[in-house]
């Protein structure tokens, strides 16, 4: 919606022309349908989409609109009805049985693996384990001393578990309840807010246990270590799919996947084929993430640098 607002702020501009000439890429053909790519509220998702936007606009000449979507349900319903075209990073462990039904009926198409592998989990800085080695595994978090160590003014007698965005796929409240841990979940609200809290805690050498994931630049920067939770089981995975509240294990390793509207292949077959071939590996993400996640560089600029450096990679996605 932003392009429509800009001409109003600059009366001398030509309102009708501005959206088609969006700064992005030269060679966009405004007569082609707009491709609506979904971005989720975490850094790697943004970078994936910016890379795709850059290449689609400059080589396939479709205008691309990036739409922020925070909830899986809205993401799947949008692709199913054709109002959204594709998402490039889905974590399968967070897909419910109800959402899988969209794949089953064909209204949403599974268009292959992204190429990166992710893992959500509980993380603490190494200095926390150096002082409290029992916290390397979940059993240490059942002890009353853990509640004291991680307690804050807001959490009272309970320890604070720092979560991030409430819209993320997460089972931490269930894990805490089902494993009888004296903790409560508090949400920072966003990935940057969690980084800010982690930075403050680390600078002061204060304990923090948090929801986090790989690949991210913060793991290396803050020397984060993953806590060993109970092993993933089929029963636990079934509980996640059914949303029955019984989750009591670690998060599984996620081979990240892509999905598209069932209508996209007809709408833009060349874009559909490109997105099927589109591949961003874990190493690719880790190459881009520090500049965006840590340094705060513009994600479109970070993506453009990656595109400029890797034409040998992405040119094969167009063939």
Describe each PLM feature range.
Residues 2-36, 150-158, 312-319:
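Immediate post-signal peptide segment of exported/extracytoplasmic ligand-binding proteins
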Residues 72-127:
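N-terminal segment of the mature folded domain
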Residues 76-78, 84-91, 160-238:
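Ligand-binding pocket segment of bilobal, Venus flytrap-like solute-binding proteins
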Residues 29-44, 62-68, 158-162, 275:
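Short, well-ordered beta-strand elements
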Residues 22-26, 43-62, 174-176:
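Short, polar/charged alpha-helical segment
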Residues 107-161:
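A conserved helix-loop-strand patch within extracytoplasmic ligand-binding domains
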Residues 119-130, 254-267, 288-291:
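A bilobed periplasmic-binding-protein/Venus flytrap-type ligand-binding module shared by bacterial periplasmic
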Residues 32, 44, 168-184, 188-205, ...:
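An extracytoplasmic/periplasmic, membrane-proximal ligand-sensing/linker region
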